[in-house]
Amino acid sequence: MLHIKYDGKIYEYAEGTTYEEIAKDFQSKYAARIALVIANGKIRELLKAPERDTEISFLTYADDAGHKSYVRTATMVLMRAMYDILPEVHPDQIKVEFSIGKGYYISVRGVNLTDAIVAKAETRMRELVEQAEPIHKQAMPKDEAIALFVQMHMDDKVKLFRYRRSSMINVYNTVSYTHLTLPTTSR
């Protein structure tokens, strides 16, 4: 059993219990949805499990880091939806250009985004959220990640990775889509 300290109290959890499962026990204490955990002072993803006794607190969508995690996940869901409805579109053609109020301006190079396409994308995004398809994290060597993103025509990511010092890169994927993100498509 692991001892998890939250808000000054100790709770026991079986080894292998993820932060996401732990977060469910405390979600009712938060007005916004829990997005990330702070474990022993470090921000962690909910899909991880504590490996030893840990002191935790949570970040929600209302917190900057939690909101950014939500936006990355929503972007992945959007890209997956676009890929599903327009399979000829490469991920590098889809750009999150800038924020507008609480929304984001998205462009798809080479595609005239009609109302019909936007409606299909929204419908597909809602389906993906409803399915709550798990998002899996995979740490891969930098060279393999670069090769993967070259194959996916994600040139901006390839350029960024070339300057990355770490030898490993975290890549996130659903059953049929790979990207750099929350534990499910519903978060």
Task: Show which residues each predicted segment covers.
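Short helix/loop capping segments that flank catalytic or ligand/cofactor-binding pockets
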Residues: 68, 115-116, 180
